[in-house]
Each structure stands twice: as C-alpha cells, then as structure tokens.
Amino acid sequence: MADQETAQSPIEEPSESAAQAAAETLADAEIPATDAAADASEGVVDDIDVIPPSDPEHLTTVVRGQDTAAAVRTAAIFDEDDEDEDDDGDEVGNDLPSFRKRDARDASNADDPDAAVMRKKKKKRHHSPEEASSMRHVTDGEVEQEEEDPYANMTEAEIRRARTDRMIDEALRAGKKKAPRKRAGEDDLDLLADEEVAALRREMVTAADDDEEANRLKKPATNKLKLLPKVVATLQKNHLQQSILDNNLLEGVKRWLEPLPDKSLPALNIQHQFFQILERMTIDTISLKMSGLGKVVVFYSMCSRVEPKIKRSAEHLIEVWSRPVLKRSSSYRDRHIASAEWNREALSQRAGPLVVGSVADNNRRNVGIPQAVTAGFRVAPQSVAGQRSDSGHEARMANHKRLNQFKSRLKEAKR
C-alpha cells in the first residue's frame, strides 16, 4: 500500500526544516571531479521532473532514486533561471533563501556540466556607453523601449575592435572642429584689429591738422609728439600689418612726415622712428599709391636739410619700392652684376704713360705727396672658381625664374 500511495501521489512537499537540512548537507559535502561523478550528475538531471513553484516558500520536486540534496541543488539552479526570465514585477528572487544562489555558483565552480549549461543562459548583453546612460535615465511612470544592441552578434574580439574604431572616429571628428577666433566678448579678432587701426588713423590725421594749425598761429606743435608712443607701438605689432595696409594707416604716416606750413621738418624723433619702422615693413605698390607715402620719401632723399642717416634710409626705401614698378626682382640671386673679361693689352696701354712719367722722375730726390684714389668700381671681376660647366645649373636658374614669375602673378591675382 505504501508503494501504491507513493506511485499515486508523485508530488511531495518537503517542509522548510527539511530544505534547510538538505542545504547544510550539500554545503558540507564534497563532489568528486571524476567521470563517474559527472555521469551520476547527468543521471540525476535526467531522473528529475521539475515543476516551477508558484509559492516561493515551497519547493516541489519529484525524485526517483536520488537523495534530497541533489534534488534541492537542481531545483535551486532552475529557480535561479526562472528568476532571470521572470519580468512581471514579482519579487520572487528576494524571498528565496540566499543559499540557492551560492549553491549554483558552487556547482559551476565544481565543474558540473549541467550547472555550466544553465549559467551560460544568463549571459549579459553588451551595451555601448550611450545606451547604458540612456537606460539609466528613466523617468517615473515611463517605460523606456529597449534599443537594439549593435554588438549583439559579435564576438569579444570584434566588440573590442568596433569600440576602438568608434573611439578613433570620435577623436578625429573632435580634431576637425576648430574653435573660432573669439574673445571674452565674442568679438572677431580681425574686426577688432580693423577698428583699432581705423581709430588710430583718425587720431593721427587729427593730430597732424592740429599741429599745422598751431604752426600757423606760431604756437608749439606738440600733438604728434604726445601720440607718437601709441603710433609706434601699433606699427611694430606684426599681427596688425595686414590691417595697417587695408585701413590705409600709411596715410597718417605721410601726414606726420610732411613739412609744416613754415617749411620746417617734423621732429627728429618722429623721423627716426618712422623710417626705422618703414624699412622693416613689407609694403605693396597699391598701398603706396593709395597713401602717397612715396612722394614724401623721395623728398627726404633729395632734401639737403635731412640728416645723412635718414637720407640713406630714404634712398634704400626708394630702391626697394621701385623694383616692383620697374618689374625687377627683389631677390639678390636675380640681380645682374656687370662683369668684364681680363684684357692685358688694354691694361698695358692704360699704364704706358704712367711708366714713362716714372722714368722721367727718377732724377728727383724729393718724395711726392700721396693722393686719395676713388675706389668706385662699377665692373665686378669675373669669377673663375665658381664656374660650373654642367647644364643643370642653367636649368635650375630657369626653374627659379619661372617660380618667381608665378609668385608675382599670384600676388597680383590676390590683389
């Protein structure tokens, strides 16, 4: 009768104390890592029929031919898998005893094949950093739709490679973004430079007019001297050179260098400062025509009241500025130097009278006074050491000439 009752009632409900005793027995027991043990564990899984419990306080299992500890272990594994698959909001995992999860980990660490298979079902999904951050920010009462994982069908190596490529692309895109040239007031630096130069030009013209008026009234003209440090500081700034040419600040320089109404020249410190700055500046032909500065510089090169140093500076400026007008290159390599071949007969004919005079004066006992000889040579001697017989030198010179012509055309096109 007992056997029949057991067959008719295949479901047993062990008490809570029995489950705890079985768990303690399982924790103290050692599972041998042999082939026989593995076969035995596989047989346990095959002989067990598991019914997921609706009540978390009871475990319902049917065991045929095995002990209670193995049944509890297998039920714990299946219950843990059911907890992962259950998304209906019931807090089943929180009510279950904690020894079940430890048992599942111990089973996987003990090389249990069935436990390893069950653990593989709980693989975590790989989410990108953007997806993880978006999934964390979920407002109350709203359910965020799960986005598709781009790394779902990739291996670990492919995921690492894809993430590395993505980081490289983001770094390259970030490097292409150039911050605009802005200041704290969000103003363009070029616009600020133009405004600064234009304001200074107006101040220079006003100071020149005031000094001319004071000179007519026989009063001291000191307005230009007061403004001179500011003008010199602005002209010496390299980043303002283009703005100086565009806003025609050279017109103010011309007004300051012009003679006053009583035919007197401006102050010497104004002359020295301006000519030193003009020698360092690169001024194009169009800016010279607009400002009219060339006429004033020619006047300084021809005036006898100008100091020799300033006069030499004016002559040098005229030589440099006139080369583009005469279509001559400013490069020293392209400059033509007059040379002549050595002619011994011409030299002997030129030295003949000197020899005769020296013979006639041999009877004189007194010594002649040495006289200065002007060494103004116009013809350079022909260089023999630097001659090149190869034709490659001529080809390089021709290429250099074509390059200079192309540069000059490019400058004219930009203007």
From Swiss-Prot:
Residues 1-154, 381-415 are annotated as: Disordered. One of its GO terms (cellular component) is nucleus. Residues 251-328 form the TFIIS N-terminal domain. Residues 118-127 have a biased composition (Basic residues). PROSITE patterns: TFIIS_N (PS51319). One of its GO terms (biological process) is poly(A)+ mRNA export from nucleus. Residues 98-108, 128-140 have a biased composition (Basic and acidic residues). Residues 78-93, 141-150 have a biased composition (Acidic residues). Residues 7-40 have a biased composition (Low complexity). Pfam families: Med26. It is found in: Nucleus. The keyword Nucleus applies. Keywords: Nucleus, Transcription, Transcription regulation. Belongs to the IWS1 family. This is Transcription factor IWS1. It comes from Mycosarcoma maydis (Corn smut fungus). The lineage of its organism: Eukaryota, Fungi, Dikarya, Basidiomycota, Ustilaginomycotina.
